[in-house]
Amino acid sequence: MRLFDVLGPVMTGPSSSHTAGAVRIGLTARNLLGEAPKTAEILLHGSFAATGRGHGTDRALVAGLLGMLPDDERIPDSFSLAQQAGLDYTIGTVVLRGAHPNTALLRLEGVSGRKLEVMGASIGGGRINICQIDGITTNFGGDHNTLIVHNQDTPGHVAEVTTALAQRGINIATMQLYRSTAGGYAVMVLECDQPLPDALITELRGMQGIVKVTGLNLAQQTETKEGA
């Protein structure tokens, strides 16, 4: 057991699940979008829906979408800061069958018109699980440098991506593969030990059959490089 698991994260309260985890869900969604969102539909499920307002979950998710970290003292003011930043958001509730009680579904549109749907759960102690991206099941927590590759489900893409990582001395900690249907749309999620350089993202983005590439460097918390 890690010390973090006992003490929990440094955060603005009141709850690690409803506040710190919610900030991280919003922040990860922003990073996956690859740019500042201009509109956000925020849908709360389960415990988030029942007690989220009293625990500040709504403000925490908006704070994350603005790029704040869980210990940011501005989290309680995120609604007014969103207005200043030009972020138009709505907050509602949803019933998600089989989802964790602390789950949020975020539908985002970025300043360039790019769209993204992310489902994330706060699983305790400020930890999160990103369980869907654009309707495709995923399973990662944002605790590593993470490479997310969207591609056509055709042979060779896994080898291309892993070769590009190996050529740069980047070790893969975990790798998960998901697809909509055989020959359809696929997503790779690779958690890595080393940071993901710009050159890697650029190279992968230029490969035939690869639709979108996102690199999340967790050492920098908010750094992201994304291309479509």
Can you annotate each of these PLM segments?
Residues 1-10, 40-43:
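Short, hydrophobic/aliphatic alpha-helical segments
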Residues 8-26:
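Conserved phosphate/anionic-ligand binding catalytic regions in large, soluble enzymes, centered on
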Residues 25, 67-70, 75-76, 84-86, ...:
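Protein-protein interaction/assembly regions in multi-subunit complexes
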Residues 30-41:
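Non-transmembrane, aqueous-exposed alpha-helical and coiled segments at domain scale
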Residues 41-84:
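A structural-propensity feature for long, helix-poor, extended segments
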Residues 51-59, 101-103, 186-194:
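Short glycine/threonine-rich loop-to-helix capping motif typified by GTGT followed
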Residues 66-116:
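Contiguous domain-boundary segments centered on the initiation and propagation of an alpha-helix
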Residues 91, 119-228:
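A conserved regulatory-domain signal marking ACT and ACT-like small-molecule sensing domains
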